[in-house]
């Protein structure tokens, strides 16, 4: 067999991972020696073979529908991938495919041990040949289901299609930000599905085979593939390792096909300590140990701890993985460079996970620690792990404070008939203690409407103040044409926005009105002012021609205008 460093046409390393067509049966001398593999490694390889077989099944269904619906031979050749098969056949005349070579090697290994009845190989090979003949272009499917957490900080985006590959199941984008800024990868751990307690305590999780069979897979063109047929079952049973996939271990590819993940009952606790170092402007999270964790696999877990400093969803830190341990001792310090003033309103999220080498990591529990109420002089603390609650920065009641002054100038109050109509003045001074969406600072501006007029003509805004969490705007906006009666029906909406290269994102805002719920006799959702906001607006009405000052929270729960 050629060495890894010297790939050749006949070697495994020269073979594509997803075959397009099938060559002749590998010769016996070209097979691989797999006698050194452990049972767990055999199951892992068998999982890849099963995924490959299911992808072939899906691709055959897609190609057959294309042949029935596309009349143009040239377009059909491109859509079905026949062009690639022809090009490959000219370049590699006798090359075998990796899946065929590994499958044949596993059959030979099994037969050598005497675990299969005579003639089994011939039947399996016939099933493989019957099933795998014909062109099969590369299939592209979603690696993992769309993330249901909202790391929900913006509009939902469809999960982009990525080539199926053995990627790191841990790294994930959690961001659904502004339009056009959605992540281009979906990874397994960050797309953790909503967990439900498993009945039976430490009962071993079982693959959801019914869902895998019933949820017929969706191809790139949006069509559904036909269900499995007996020839596929024969192909999957061509080695004992493939048949062993009925056990509790699922590969990442199978997880993606079924669209569901396994859940374990959350239990146990985590021991940790928090310390802030003013000199280094650094928050230090000392993860000491966990006790009584749930067993994820075969009465064991491979746990590690992951932390986020919410609402920054890019602030992930992780400990090392402790193998086969339900009471792991980590003794690791996770560090965050953050000014002490920014800790107000931040929430530390500590979650415990089982590291799955081939599939989706399994959630074991989490705790959330609001830092504004934390006793920094306390000793290391034990907290019980809780079921998963999707972290959403939008759940924060406020993202900072807005300092402003208001003044109402009635018509003719300045003499000589000036101003000709009532004027409403807004002096936007500054924002304080803003909470960023991600690590780093913000590029912010304030936008103002006086409702019910939400047209672009009514919109005014400040300049953009870049790279600051306490931006100073010092900007005045003036609206005219308002009488005292109009102010009782109006609502001034001031919102703070993060300016992005592709799109802007609202961080929070305030609404100044009497909060009656109606405007000019109509019920409206934007008359939802808080007591603080009502008090400031009432002071404006009672003190014409005088500035009234306010320091208001930038609410994240502003009701939609319509």
Curated annotation (Swiss-Prot):
One of its GO terms (biological process) is exocytosis. Residues 1-29, 94-255 are annotated as: Disordered. SMART domains: C2 (SM00239). SUPFAM superfamilies: C2 domain (Calcium/lipid-binding domain, CaLB) (SSF49562). Highly expressed in bone marrow and lymphoid tissues. Detected at lower levels in cerebellum, occipital lobe, prostate, stomach, kidney, appendix, lung and trachea. Expressed in cytotoxic T-lymphocytes (CTL). Residues 206-219 have a biased composition (Polar residues). The keyword Repeat applies. Monomer. Binds NRXN1. Binds RAB27A that has been activated by GTP-binding via its N-terminus. Binds NCF2. This is Synaptotagmin-like protein 1. It comes from Homo sapiens (Human).
